[in-house]
Amino acid sequence: MPCEELEIVWKNIKAEARALADCEPMLASFYHATLLKHENLGSALSYMLANKLASPIMPAIAIREVVEEAYAADPEMIASAACDIQAVRTRDPAVDKYSTPLLYLKGFHALQAYRIGHWLWNKGRRALAIFLQNQVSVSFQVDIHPAAKIGRGIMLDHATGIVVGETAVIEDDVSILQSVTLGGTGKTSGDRHPKIREGVMIGAGAKILGNIEVGRGAKIGAGSVVLQPVPPHTTAAGVPARIVGKPGSDKPSMDMDQHFNGIHHTFEYGDGI
């Protein structure tokens, strides 16, 4: 996301916060502490993450110091967060404000905390990265390994129960609903987790297991168990999953259409993909 777009997102957030504070005086101090007193999105993010992830072992002031260190070293993380905010605002019909993900949505919070953990992991500070992973799991019920590779423009919708394994890859503009697992198939080490390409939508409760690719613009139906690669621009569903059609757009993650080309299928156990 270009810098000017990042600034536009932040200006929208500040304007919304001022209107919200005027509309609901009981929350005015909350909006001031979380949004209005901050000069930029990075400052607001560091404050929010620090307070969400604080514990007796590592208080908020210490976590905020780590977050601010990461943002100073890699400002692209803030731009990625703005892309994630824009993704949620665009794709989730229940979200009508840019400020909502930053204030309230744990999928967004978990994703931004992952980005800090990923930076720490790549810097060799793996003990702290794993500590933050645990705090995210305890606080948000989302378990993302800090070594996983995740792009921008990501929506983790509802987010409870999402698991992303160590060698998983999630490219840009992907939407993932609650209780999705991107997991391995056993105790084998090495590259063992799914690769989710750009524009994919993964429905609630889907399990994608093993070092397999879900191709660009594919759609995975809710509750599916995917054990084989999914070709680009196809829809896979069932237990085990099989190809049932094609999405209605190049990037199903953007339109979030849960239907299969308007056809209502009755699923049976099949031969898989």
Curated annotation (Swiss-Prot):
It catalyses: L-serine + acetyl-CoA = O-acetyl-L-serine + CoA. Its EC number is 2.3.1.30. GO terms for cellular component: cytosol. One of its GO terms (biological process) is cysteine biosynthetic process from serine. It is found in: Cytoplasm. Keywords: Acyltransferase, Amino-acid biosynthesis, Cysteine biosynthesis, Cytoplasm, Repeat, Transferase. It is an enzyme of class 2 (transferase). Pathway: Amino-acid biosynthesis; L-cysteine biosynthesis; L-cysteine from L-serine: step 1/2. PROSITE patterns: HEXAPEP_TRANSFERASES. Sensitive to feedback inhibition by L-cysteine. Gene3D superfamilies: Hexapeptide repeat proteins (2.160.10.10), serine acetyltransferase, domain 1 (1.10.3130.10). GO terms for molecular function: serine O-acetyltransferase activity. Belongs to the transferase hexapeptide repeat family. Part of the cysteine synthase complex formed at a ratio of 1 copy of this protein and 2 copies of O-acetylserine sulfhydrylase (cysK). The complex reversibly dissociates in the presence of O-acetyl-L-serine in the absence of hydrogen sulfide. PANTHER family: SERINE ACETYLTRANSFERASE. This is Serine acetyltransferase. It comes from Salmonella typhimurium (strain LT2 / SGSC1412 / ATCC 700720). The gene is cysE.
